[in-house]
Amino acid sequence: MKTVYAFLADGMEEVEALMVIDLLRRTKKLNVVTVSIKDELLVKSSHNIKLYADKNINEIDFSSGDCIFLPGGMPGTTNLGACEKLADEIVEYNNQGKLLAAICAAPTVFSNLGLLKDKNATSYPSFEDQMECNNYGGGVVRD
């Protein structure tokens, strides 16, 4: 069974996180693990909803994962982007050709790491100026 690591940071958009996590878990074909980027499992959303991650970033074996998923929201996206360990692993996943997925503002994390320069990508429209990619736009982009 493939493993998706869904990263949670304080200030994330809870609908973007929980909707994706819920839908992926309902397939019963994926092992979806929610991961806090801090030592504490408790994560507060942008609307102060408290969620408990399954694990923290130091408890997972990145090599056993198949996908990294980042929900958007602010300041959640900023917090995800500031997590050096996560950034290093995103680059490694990209180098290995593993799946990277993000929604809303979170694709900017990939852009800031220089991973979208030759890719088609999209984001929440107000973040377009932060997206350094080959071709911008569209509701859903896979590249």
Predicted features along the sequence, with ranges:
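Active-site-adjacent pocket-lining segments in enzyme domains
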Residues: 3-6, 12, 28-36, 54-143
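Short N-terminal binding/cap micro-motifs at the start of the first secondary-structure element
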Residues: 12-17, 42
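Generic helix-packing signal
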Residues: 21-24, 125
